[in-house]
């Protein structure tokens, strides 16, 4: 038996974008995504929402549901620590509080994550499995379009400022299912 990986509506490829921290610049970014039918995952820190004095400012809780409608919300910890340096109890508290707060605001079940500062290890991945986190994005790019073998170590293809971004975009646009 053959198993074929496909995306919604049987599509052979998917473009996803992932941005962290819920910065005020998301207002403009989401409007561009919406204009072109691009969907993204926005990894938010519940502990920074509505906090005054942050530079750049963050999206207010009152704007989250409207702004990110049609996009995914994922965890990014409460306070953005470098979690591989933290005791596991603190990591669990950071994730659970972030998830609970985001679920309270959005009314959605939150299952994704992006590691703050790209910080993770095997012990953290095991903890995330126990906490119900289904996937987590790392910082280091994979430089290809393959799906991850470990969803808790999901490497992006590239970053938006990658020198070879346009080459990758052209390859992706020309890709045809065989």
Label for each model-derived stretch:
Residues 34-124, 141-154, 158, 178:
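Metal-dependent polysaccharide deacetylase catalytic core of the NodB/CE4 family, i.e.
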């Amino acid at each position: 038996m053959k198993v074929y990986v496909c995306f919604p509506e049987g599509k052979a490829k998917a473009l996803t974008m992932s941005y962290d921290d819920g910065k005020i610049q998301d207002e403009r970014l989401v409007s561009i995504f919406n204009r072109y039918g691009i969907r993204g995952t926005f990894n938010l820190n519940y502990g920074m929402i509505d906090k005054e004095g942050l530079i750049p400012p963050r999206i207010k809780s009152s704007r989250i549901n409207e702004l990110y409608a049609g996009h995914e919300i994922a965890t990014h910890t409460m306070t953005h620590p470098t979690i591989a340096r933290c005791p596991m109890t603190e990591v669990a508290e950071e994730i659970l509080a972030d998830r609970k707060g985001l679920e309270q605001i959005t009314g959605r079940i939150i299952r994704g994550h992006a590691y703050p500062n790209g910080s993770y290890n095997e012990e953290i991945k095991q903890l995330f499995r126990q906490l119900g986190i289904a996937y987590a994005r790392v910082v280091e790019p994979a430089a290809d379009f393959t799906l991850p073998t470990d969803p808790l170590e999901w490497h992006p293809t590239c970053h938006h400022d990658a020198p070879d971004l346009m080459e990758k975009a052209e390859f992706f646009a020309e890709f045809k299912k065989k």
